[in-house]
Amino acid sequence: MSTNDEENGTVIEVKNVPEPSPETWYSVFLRQASVYGVAAGYCLSASLLSIINKWAIMKFPYPGALTAMQYFTSAAGVLLCAQMKLIEHDSLNLLTMWRFLPAAMIFYLSLFTNSELLLHANVDTFIVFRSAVPIFVAIGETLFLHQPWPSVKTWGSLATIFGGSLLYVFTDYQFTIAAYSWALAYLVSMTIDFVYIKHVVMTIGLNTWGLVLYNNLEALLLFPLELLIMGELKKIKHEITDETDWYSLQVVLPVGLSCLFGLAISFFGFSCRRAISATGFTVLGIVNKLLTVVINLMVWDKHSTFVGTLGLLVCMFGGVMYQQSTIKKPNATQEAKPQEQDEEQEKLLEMQENKESNSVDIKETLKSEEKL
């Protein structure tokens, strides 16, 4: 269709824009199947990761080396997916790597205190103190990042976590000074880690996959230092001289699956955040945490008492309340960017939590084997 411009005497072509066709049942089915498939993949990878890690560490009893291979797989996976145009990440830059180095070092410190805590206490104690981290992170954000004090609803959730922690501590029959000293050290290191990581996310200017790449790559570069400090290098050299069956299928298969599932939980976790609501993602997280507690009760022989387990569940419930109270609902366009920054932070912290969960499974398996 064309019209004449009376002033200029030119003909203006007016194109009829076709209206978007309504969705067919097939397209709706594919979209819903994609959402449920991503959610199922996240639950499957998160719940099976601990079992596969236990299998891998029994066949390859070197937690530092296994964790390093998981770091390598995650970093290589990001680079490969970027080459295939599936994701986008920030390019590697030496100056940015130098700026990110303190965050990687603090992350390693949190893993070290995590390992020492597991050597002196059971998994229940770890879960309780891990659940108490948001209390001190909220205070640290206010004091050092100039964030507003939490709302009344958030304080209520933090108080629930604190109450559950006290209930657990007062009924812990395995209480020792050494265990709770390392628990406090873990609490402090994790608080510093989370607050500093948020500072990095807010100031360093990397997107989600860029943060994942830098975090895993620099953690991998720090691995030789851990190898020397923890004495794992001597053990590996001893095994090499004994010509063990490292290259057999019974070793390569569980180690390979452990690395692949570590990457899968990151991929499905980020995909879930895009495909479902924050509430739905929280529900999936609850299911995975409950499965962790159930597996812990079924596999290990030393647990907290019934009241202690109840306190642990109260802590988890408080954590759910805390997640819900911090979900932001933007009312205007200018609020979109801060919310995106918060999502970037949550995704990186989720990645760190996954790495720590891997360390929990690996260290606890070794501890149980030593008792046997």
Curated annotation (Swiss-Prot):
This is GDP-mannose transporter GONST3. GO terms for biological process: nucleotide-sugar transmembrane transport. One of its GO terms (molecular function) is antiporter activity. Belongs to the nucleotide-sugar transporter family. GDP-Mannose:GMP antiporter (GMA) (TC 2.A.7.13) subfamily. It holds the Pfam family TPT. Keywords: Antiport, Golgi apparatus, Membrane, Sugar transport, Transmembrane, Transmembrane helix, Transport. It is a multi-pass membrane protein. The chain crosses the membrane at residues 33-53, 60-80, 92-112, 125-145, 155-175, 177-197, 209-229, 251-271, 280-300, 303-323. One of its GO terms (cellular component) is Golgi membrane. GDP-mannose transporter that may be involved in the import of GDP-mannose from the cytoplasm into the Golgi lumen. It is found in: Golgi apparatus membrane. InterPro entries: Sugar_P_trans_dom, TPT_transporter. Expressed in rosette leaves, stems, flowers and siliques. Residues 331-372 are annotated as: Disordered.
